[in-house]
Amino acid sequence: MSRYRGPRLKKIRRLGALPGLTRKTPKSGSNQKKKFNSGKKEQYRIRLQEKQKLRFHYGLTERQLLRYVHIAGKAKRSTGQVLLQLLEMRLDNILFRLGMASTIPGARQLVNHRHILVNGRIVDIPSFRCKPRDIITTKDNQRSKRLVQNSIASSDPANLPKHLTVDTLQYKGLVKKILDRKWVGLKVNELLVVEY
């Protein structure tokens, strides 16, 4: 699948903070001019921006996001909440939220290069859907542990969501349960994404 490889700070300036995309922050004086339109164009622009926030934060293509919206639409609960739960339970996002990778693209690279085990098996698919009671560890070699060690050392344990636990000494994470809406690490209105 293709990924966004272009300038990341441009996306952050346009869409706001996207912690999964990059750790960089734009300079404070780089605010762009706000263009005010009225009517349908304004509503369309707001919905499009919310959708783009989700896409760029989680590193999804348009087709992947549509597939997740379709799956969430079949659920009996709120479509927006189910969509966020599906996206938050992806393996690359879980690694990012555990602090084992500094960004979601970095987590994708760890998974693609076969450094990550889920329940004792190598998983090389970043979109792998984790379930409650899944144990996520690194491969038992120095190179894999060193890659994760740097990220864990620089991460803040206070930002760890309640649905995850991490053992920093053994480089092991546990998914305790499916997350609540309040622990999503992105300010987004998921209902506007579903309406788009």
Curated annotation (Swiss-Prot):
Q: Which Pfam families match?
A: Ribosomal_S4, S4
Q: Which gene specifies this protein's sequence?
A: rps4
Keywords associated with the record: Chloroplast, Plastid, Ribonucleoprotein, Ribosomal protein, RNA-binding, rRNA-binding
Q: Name the segments for region: Disordered.
A: 15-42
> Of which family is this protein a member?
Belongs to the universal ribosomal protein uS4 family.
The record ties this protein, via SUPFAM superfamilies, to:
Alpha-L RNA-binding motif
- Source species, domain of life: Eukaryota
According to its UniProt entry, the function of this protein is described as: One of the primary rRNA binding proteins, it binds directly to 16S rRNA where it nucleates assembly of the body of the 30S subunit.
Subunit structure as annotated in this protein's UniProt entry: Part of the 30S ribosomal subunit. Contacts protein S5. The interaction surface between S4 and S5 is involved in control of translational fidelity.
Looking up PROSITE patterns in the UniProt record yields: RIBOSOMAL_S4, S4
Please state what the protein is called.
Answer: Small ribosomal subunit protein uS4c
Q: Does the keyword ATP-binding apply?
A: no
What HAMAP family does this protein's entry cite?
Answer: Ribosomal_uS4_B (MF_01306_B)
Of the GO CC terms on this record, one is: chloroplast
Q: Which GO terms describe its molecular function?
A: rRNA binding; structural constituent of ribosome
Identify the Gene3D superfamilies for this entry: Ribosomal Protein S4 Delta 41, Chain A, domain 1, RNA-binding S4 domain
PANTHER family in the record = 30S 40S RIBOSOMAL PROTEIN (PTHR11831), SMALL RIBOSOMAL SUBUNIT PROTEIN US4M (PTHR11831:SF4)
Q: Which SMART domains match?
A: Ribosomal_S4, S4
Domain S4 RNA-binding residues, every copy: 89-150
